[in-house]
């Protein structure tokens, strides 16, 4: 028995210690029995920050939010059985949004598998192709070789999570009873520790000089170009993309998640209203770029995606550090395996300065005309969902974070988050674009990003109510704006809306819930606003005070659709008139 406890303590102690040596210092733990030894050792280690979250599905997204904000791997720990299965949605999102998670699942030992033992199921490769790597850890043994193995496996798995493209990894730990480690053991954290840690260093891929020279030569003869920046671009992409735009004269179509629309950098070349004006048929037929250079994930805008698809004669360059073929438009002619920064730097160094021509001025002019028209919605007294975004940005302080939920909030952010000199970070879960786990992801991010305001629809809010527990347990500061249109507002914009007979029951899905009591249960404050002045006051108050604050604004789905269509129609008229004037 003593030999088992000693092996358990030293073996798992070496694993936990190696996590901290590799700067994985945050772990989200859901309570359970089989994970007891790892949980206790993590709580005991002075280098580890532990966060309890009872619901595993919410816990997974909470860890995802911390990792997204810190841009470092975060660990997740749960017991065996369906607890591990509840991590699946967050693991899928982490994989597709390239967020490093270290998923740790406890398991029954091999003799208790496939024999009907309680709380035992097949956890081998549980997450399938949605993790970069899986390993089944060996059972604890008391030997220097096994302590070294525990550390080396930790190093290998963290390296896998952190190398481009980043993503989740899964370690499955079979353990036998008894499960309580012995903290009185001498040198508990030192077993198997070498002088150095095995860290894989990844440098920026060097751009081949021959390719750079060839590309510079081609671009020098292409006056009509576009730079498109999507989600998960490099944090310094704003500086380098704007320099490249200045050199080439190509406008930057900046997705809100690229974080190029706001900040202290020069935004002369930044186009922010393309989602609206690229709906114009005349413009789509007459504006034909020679080349498109894209960084990051595919932008939110469907209008932009459709525009890209139509450019069948253009050169399409997709820059991706991992070399993955991320081209849902199916038009890429070149995929360059390099970091955004390495690519931009190489071109900036060798590109001659190309004068701003009519091409850039056309985009800039139409962008300003569109923005002028869209800003008319700031005069609407009606609870228009697009104005939610502009009014939040108006009162957010410098350095704040806006987290946009999926469905309508991220689309309204795309349409109505205009360029700003304030430094406001925009975040979202755009890996697989689900509405689950949004509250939990935002709460995880709020541990690093303060103040943080989440904009979320009522159905997405309902979907992750359990996530609010983290705000109470860990005393987090967050303001949640619930846009309550009593249902799935995005479906009003889709063809399903025309099927009136079954629309409300299958797509509109009103649930008629009063969230005030739920928010109070989790220790938060709740306000239901009437009017835009009160809305701005409540958001501003929430962003400058501690705790959980939920601000509900009630909207009407049909009215919201009508107002969106009214704005779009007016902008199309303005754009068409402007284009026809230019052609005369």
From Swiss-Prot:
Q: What is the cofactor note?
A: Binds 1 thiamine pyrophosphate per subunit.
Q: Which cofactor(s) are needed, names only?
A: Mg(2+); Mn(2+); thiamine diphosphate
* Record lineage: Bacteria, Bacillati, Bacillota, Bacilli, Bacillales
Which keywords label this protein?
Answer: Magnesium, Manganese, Menaquinone biosynthesis, Metal-binding, Thiamine pyrophosphate, Transferase
| Name of one Pfam family that matches | TPP_enzyme_M_2
Write down what this protein is called: 2-succinyl-5-enolpyruvyl-6-hydroxy-3-cyclohexene-1-carboxylate synthase
Pathway assigned in UniProt:
Quinol/quinone metabolism; 1,4-dihydroxy-2-naphthoate biosynthesis; 1,4-dihydroxy-2-naphthoate from chorismate: step 2/7; Quinol/quinone metabolism; menaquinone biosynthesis
Q: Name one GO biological process term.
A: menaquinone biosynthetic process
What InterPro entries would the database entry show?
DHS-like_NAD/FAD-binding_dom, MenaQ_synth_MenD, MenD_middle, THDP-binding, Thiamin_PyroP_enz_TPP-bd_dom, TPP_enzyme_TPP-bd
How is the subunit organization of this protein annotated in UniProt? Homodimer.
Q: Reaction catalysed? A: isochorismate + 2-oxoglutarate + H(+) = 5-enolpyruvoyl-6-hydroxy-2-succinyl-cyclohex-3-ene-1-carboxylate + CO2
* GN (gene name): menD
> Which species does the entry assign this protein to?
Bacillus thuringiensis (strain Al Hakam)
């Amino acid at each position: 028995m003593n030999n088992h406890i000693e092996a358990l303590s030293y073996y798992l102690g070496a694993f936990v210690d190696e996590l901290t040596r590799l700067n994985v210092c945050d772990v989200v733990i859901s309570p359970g029995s089989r994970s007891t030894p790892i949980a206790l050792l993590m709580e005991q280690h002075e280098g580890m920050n532990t966060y309890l979250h009872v619901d595993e599905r919410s816990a997974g997204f909470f860890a995802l939010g911390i990792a997204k904000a810190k841009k470092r791997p975060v660990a997740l720990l749960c017991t065996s059985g369906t607890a591990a299965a509840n991590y699946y949605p967050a693991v899928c999102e982490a994989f597709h949004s390239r967020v490093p998670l270290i998923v740790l699942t406890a398991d029954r030992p091999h003799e208790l598998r496939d024999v009907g033992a309680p709380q035992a199921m097949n956890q081998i490769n549980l997450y399938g192709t949605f993790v970069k790597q899986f390993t089944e850890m060996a059972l604890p043994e008391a030997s220097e070789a096994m302590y070294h193995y525990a550390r080396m496996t930790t190093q290998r798995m963290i390296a896998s999570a952190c190398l481009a493209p980043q993503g989740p990894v899964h370690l499955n730990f079979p353990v036998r009873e008894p499960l309580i480690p012995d903290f009185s053991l001498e040198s508990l954290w030192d077993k198997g520790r070498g002088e150095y840690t095995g860290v894989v260093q990844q440098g920026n891929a060097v751009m081949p000089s021959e390719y750079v020279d060839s590309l510079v030569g081609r671009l020098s003869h292409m006056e009509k170009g576009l730079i498109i920046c999507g989600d998960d671009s490099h944090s310094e992409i704003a500086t380098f993309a704007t320099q490249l735009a200045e050199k080439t004269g190509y406008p930057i179509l900046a997705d809100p998640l690229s974080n190029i629309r706001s900040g202290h950098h020069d935004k002369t070349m930044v186009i922010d209203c393309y989602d609206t004006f690229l709906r114009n048929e005349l413009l789509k037929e007459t504006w034909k770029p020679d080349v498109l250079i894209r960084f990051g994930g595919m932008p939110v805008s469907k209008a932009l995606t459709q525009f890209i698809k139509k450019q069948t004669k253009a050169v399409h360059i997709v820059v991706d550090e991992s070399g993955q073929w991320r081209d849902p438009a199916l038009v890429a002619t070149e995929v360059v395996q390099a970091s955004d920064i390495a690519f931009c730097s190489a071109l900036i160094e060798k590109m001659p300065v190309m004068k701003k021509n009519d091409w850039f001025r056309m985009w800039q002019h139409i962008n300003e005309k569109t923005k002028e028209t869209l800003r008319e919605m700031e005069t609407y007294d009606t609870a228009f969902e697009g104005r939610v975004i502009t009014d939040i940005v108006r009162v957010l302080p410098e350095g704040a974070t806006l987290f946009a939920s999926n469905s309508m909030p991220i689309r309204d952010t795309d349409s109505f988050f205009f360029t700003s000199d304030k430094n406001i970070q925009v975040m979202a879960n755009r890996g697989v674009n689900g509405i689950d786990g949004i509250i939990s992801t935002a709460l995880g991010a709020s541990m690093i990003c303060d103040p943080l305001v989440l904009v979320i629809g009522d159905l997405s809010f309902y979907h992750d109510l359990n996530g609010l527990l983290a705000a109470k347990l860990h005393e987090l500061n967050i303001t949640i704006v619930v846009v309550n249109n009593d249902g799935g507002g995005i479906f009003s914009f889709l063809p399903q809306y025309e099927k009136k007979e079954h629309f409300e029951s299958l797509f509109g899905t009103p649930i008629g819930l009063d969230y005030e009591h739920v928010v109070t249960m989790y220790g938060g404050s709740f306000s239901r606003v009437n009017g835009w002045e009160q809305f701005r006051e409540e958001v501003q108050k929430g962003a400058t005070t501690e705790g959980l604050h939920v601000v509900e604004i009630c909207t009407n789905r049909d009215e919201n659709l009508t107002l969106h269509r009214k704005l779009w129609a007016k902008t199309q008229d303005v754009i068409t008139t402007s284009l026809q004037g230019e052609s005369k």
